[in-house]
Amino acid sequence: MSKSAVSPMMQQYLGIKAQHTDKLVFYRMGDFYELFLDDAVEAAKLLDITLTTRGQMDGVPIKMAGVPFHAAEQYLARLVKLGKSVAICEQVGEVGAGKGPVERKVVRIVTPGTLTDSALLEDKETNRIVAVSPDKKYIGLAWASLQSGEFKTKLTTADKLNDELARLQAAEILLPDSKNAPQLQTASGVTRLNAWQFAADAGEKLLTEYFGCQDLRGFGLDSKEHAVSIGAAGALLNYIRLTQNLMPQHLDGLSLETDSQYIGMDAATRRNLEITQTLSGKKTPTLFSILDGCATHMGSRLLALWLHHPLRNRAHIRARQEAVTALESQYEPLQCHLKSIADIERIAARIAVGNARPRDLASLRDSLFELAQIDLSATGSSLLETLKAVFPETLPVAETLKAAVMPEPSVWLKDGNVINHGFHPELDELRRIQNHGDEFLLDLEAKERERTGLSTLKVEFNRVHGFYIELSKTQAEQAPADYQRRQTLKNAERFITPELKAFEDKVLTAQDQALALEKQLFDGVLKNLRTALPQLQKAAKAAAALDVLSTFSALAKERNFVRPEFADYPVVHIENGRHPVVEQQVRHFTANHTDLDHKHRLMLLTGPNMGGKSTYMRQVALIVLLAHTGCFVPADAATIGPVDQIFTRIGASDDLASNRSTFMVEMSETAYILHHATEQSIVLMDEVGRGTSTFDGLALAHAIAEHLLQKNKSFSLFATHYFELTYLPEAHAAAVNMHLSALEQGRDIVFLHQIQPGPAGKSYGIAVAKLAGLPVRALKAAQKHLNGLENQAAANRPQLDIFSTMPSEKGDEPNVDCFVDKAEEKHFEGILAAALENLDPDSLTPREALSELYRLKDLCKSVS
């Protein structure tokens, strides 16, 4: 395509677009951002805006679409949510300053991971960008948040990469454009960069220059050992510099993160526990949404961070617990202060990248003064004392802003009225000229009326024609000779005089000069604030931590959460534990105990469908998780030993993108658990093996349970409908049978949701199907088939020889016939016990008692 065939403006556009082929270009033209050619077609489709044409290029109409400048943020937000990146091209030259189009250049690039504008961000979500740099053995990760200044790195392995990305909840992922780039479970938000940008040498050079140090050892990074992490961090910092068109000034150091800092949770566990997102992808009801009572958006974001990063350091946990206890008496006054605090964290980020607005500074000023008034004296908490000590450090910044910024400044700097009176003498003088213009005009009008004797004479102003003297048509002919005609209207004539023209020039010049000076002064204020960014970030973090801790304190009081105890020996003891989310969704929640220790490491959980097995297991995991955030827990008491990881294998779903069936997903997640769980891990296994044939599933479930008992030795909750597995406690002393109870009332079933010792008597599957609304005919047929299958299973005992090849804990072969007999005996005992439990002998008539006796006899025949 020949550039000579297009206009100079389009030549300019094509030159800019050639540098940003992978992005949409917002090209500023007056009060609009315009998009051209393929960008226009894509934007029109994504944003539902009008696609039109303007001019031609090589004989073809140029496609064009545009959005108003003042509404650009909402369109940018929509594009970013769709994973698009946008290059913002502004007019930087003066209109009419020379030949050709006005000078334009890309001033910033908006990408999903580098947002700072509040209109483009979710208030309660942290926006992170992650760089991934692989080598043959390890993968280096680096991530940053431009809103908080967070900048961290970590070494990981390929099998843990997707779990790390799930933990970080990356909005954008930077990958090298090479064949050895790792495979991700998500394709959205991925940006490919040239592989050389991840080079460790270049990364170390850029990082040492940025931090002003000779090497990175002070950050815990060794040039050889952490080469891939350094390469990732360097690529990330360079990408931020390119997109923001400047080097960020607020990244808070570079820290090396290790697995030992936090309790590990893989992607499946975070999903199954519904920490910040439900299984259906919604934001409520989740653990975060139920707990979040924070007064500030900073606090809400920190709460989500703590929930995804439960601590392992007991000293840090106890410090949080002590603060929660101390804040019980301080909650109300503290909340009054916190509710007045703006989002200091994000305001600081906008100051750092140069796009803070006047009202950002006013909000920052008011918030800093508010924080300085917080009184946390005599709390006895060292953590609270440390947090409070941060706030006085920002008072000089607040005083500077008080002097520099109007109490209620304009939204936009271009509208003026931003810099405070008395801050700069020259600005005050220019404003005086503007503001006292009304007095001059009134005096001039009175003087001219007296001089001319014309009663209809008025002195007025509008933005198009400036200042003028207006006379009615009838008196216009009597205008003095020094009146120069400016505009003719239907019923009036407008004039200008040398005196009025001189005043107009003075006022308009003063206005332009004042706006230019305000911009200069505002930029100076921002420059000074950048030197105070470390103090502002510390204040933001301290305010957020106070907010979360006070929220924890309120939860303890309002929802009867208790302070958990920590032990150095293996134990998970919970008295009357409750599911923190479910108990808020139902009228009555049944609390349950949990007892796991060195003697009992695996709880074999049986019971009816809808009986509450999954809820109970999640409840245990969530209580353990909450305890390690410093939050109190929903229970009467809790004691928890060392925990390194939490694993879950719950639910079923296909992975069509990876061509994996439901059963394949289940086995992959199970394999990961068996390879990584340790003696200090919490493992939840729900209905393992149900995705294949009955005996295959039973064999796998048995083998997995034994592996957890003998090899992993983790604290495991193992829910199953395979009643044959209930023999495990006889072969393995570390296993214990528990069940969720239910009560049959005639042909109906009542779920008691109560954990009780021993195996369940039956699954009540048909009763649950009845509750679901299956037709009566289908239910009767199911009952008939069930009776037949149970009789057939009893007659074909040799089919259960699948366990004959499995060694017991002692290494000998289990007696299969004995296993079958005992399992069936337990099954029969459970059914008989359930039937007897429903009888009330004192209320039966003789005839009813005889009838019940016959029914029990028939029941014995059906299961014998």
Swiss-Prot record:
Q: Where does ATP bind?
A: 607-614
What are the protein's GO molecular function terms?
ATP binding; ATP-dependent DNA damage sensor activity; damaged DNA binding; mismatched DNA binding
Q: Which UniProt keywords apply?
A: ATP-binding, DNA damage, DNA repair, DNA-binding, Nucleotide-binding
Q: Which PROSITE patterns match?
A: DNA_MISMATCH_REPAIR_2 (PS00486)
- The reply on keyword DNA damage is yes
- Give the matching Pfam families: MutS_I (PF01624), MutS_II (PF05188), MutS_III (PF05192), MutS_IV (PF05190), MutS_V (PF00488)
For biological process, the GO terms are:
mismatch repair
On the tree of life, the source organism's domain of life is Bacteria
Instruction: Give yes or no: UniProt keyword DNA repair.
Output: yes
Please give the GO cellular component terms listed in this UniProt entry: cytosol
SUPFAM superfamilies, A to Z: DNA repair protein MutS, domain I, DNA repair protein MutS, domain II, DNA repair protein MutS, domain III, P-loop containing nucleoside triphosphate hydrolases
What does the function comment of this entry state?
Answer: This protein is involved in the repair of mismatches in DNA. It is possible that it carries out the mismatch recognition step. This protein has a weak ATPase activity.
Give the family this protein belongs to, as stated in its UniProt record. Answer: Belongs to the DNA mismatch repair MutS family.
Q: What name has this protein been given in UniProt?
A: DNA mismatch repair protein MutS
| Organism field | Neisseria gonorrhoeae (strain ATCC 700825 / FA 1090)
What gene name is given for the protein in this entry? Answer: mutS
